[in-house]
Amino acid sequence: MDYAALYQKKLTSAAEAVKVVKSGDWVDYGWCTNHPYTLDKALAARQNELKDVKVRGGVTMWMPEICKAEDAGEHFTWNSWHCSGIDRKIISKGMGYFIPMRYSELPRFYRDGNATVDVAMIQVTPMDKHGNFSYALACSHFCLLYT
């Protein structure tokens, strides 16, 4: 199979990719540096079209674009598995929650279906010649979404 050709066929813009997100969806952003920077910006641009989108991440390294607008909490709710200082700022704005758990439990939440995920968006490495991507810091649990 020619993975590079298949990848090129599926490749789309961030603005087009985030059109799959609907009001009420759970969107998973991954962890730390895996947060989808470009997709986050595109999703924030759709803010006025959406209500009650629940976004989940952890150890946030930069303020997500979806959290920056004045009325962001009317459209998006941030849910953090583990809080960084940025996650705490989002929660203090009244638009986020902390999900208490131990990191070692995280794969089970996904494996057993306890973490609803309608849309998953994370940054990965470029595809290698075998068609593989690296989940990097999210590999302990994100791979369970695609198996």
Kindly give the residue locations of the regions a language model identified.
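Conserved alpha/beta enzyme-core scaffold
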Residues: 1-145
